[in-house]
């Protein structure tokens, strides 16, 4: 049985391993950079592990195989579940224990909803970017960009409402978020580290995967900062601000 599985496996280059066996469903194969359509040629330093020319059904099935999109997909799918779980926890425990107002519930709900939309749109694009229809791929890419915009909106809604409510003491938290975002963007545009290790980081450790993980870290940091500022605001109101109302 073990020998049969090895015979039916697709062999990939995984780091220093030249022939690493990967089982893929029937109808799915992994391509090299030279074999994929132009629309998928974004990073020449990722040389192998591409999915391409798949119908929707097989795109979904490819969620459970090892490809160069696996980390990109699962990092944001798990990110979605993280923010979904945080939403339930915030609404049932964190906000009530802080004697949060109706406005707090609304702001935190908007923030976490935006983060979840961002994660799901990203998952959708990276899952269906291998679709045989280039038009479908471009639609999912547009949704991915829209999701990024919605995620940024979630940051600004809570930021405007809380961060500078009374003073600028919370500015360092905002700065940290932007530093993480900048770091993620630098990995994205520089294509480091795979630029220095072509073909060695096709499946794990590429710049886009680091970008995805840092995006989750950034949004999680912003959520934690929002909760922190909300709790601080309720425990230590701003008398100077209130006196001028």
Which residues fall in each region the model found?
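Multi-pass alpha-helical transmembrane bundles in non-GPCR membrane proteins
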Residues: 1-245
């Amino acid at each position: 049985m073990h020998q049969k599985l090895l015979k039916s496996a697709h062999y990939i280059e995984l780091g220093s391993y030249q022939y690493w066996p990967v089982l893929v469903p029937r109808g799915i194969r992994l391509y090299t950079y030279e074999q994929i359509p132009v629309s998928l040629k974004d990073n020449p330093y990722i040389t192998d592990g591409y999915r391409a020319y798949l119908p929707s059904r097989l795109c979904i099935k490819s969620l459970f195989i090892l490809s160069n999109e696996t980390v990109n997909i699962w990092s944001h799918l798990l990110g979605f579940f993280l923010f979904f779980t945080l939403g339930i926890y915030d609404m049932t425990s964190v906000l009530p224990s802080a004697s949060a107002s109706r406005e707090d519930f609304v702001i935190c709900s908007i923030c976490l909803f935006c983060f979840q939309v961002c994660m799901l749109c990203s998952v959708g694009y990276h899952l269906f970017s291998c679709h045989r229809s280039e038009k479908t791929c471009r639609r999912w890419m547009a949704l991915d960009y829209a999701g990024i915009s919605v995620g940024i909106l979630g940051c600004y809604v809570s930021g405007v409402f809380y961060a500078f409510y009374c003073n600028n003491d919370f500015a360092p938290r905002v700065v940290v978020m932007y530093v993480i975002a900048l770091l993620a963007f630098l990995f994205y545009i520089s294509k480091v580290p795979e630029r220095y290790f072509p073909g060695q980081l096709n499946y794990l450790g590429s710049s886009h995967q680091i970008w995805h993980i840092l995006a989750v870290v950034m949004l999680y940091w912003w959520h934690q900062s929002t909760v922190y500022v909300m709790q601080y605001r309720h425990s230590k109101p701003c008398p100077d601000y209130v006196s001028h109302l």
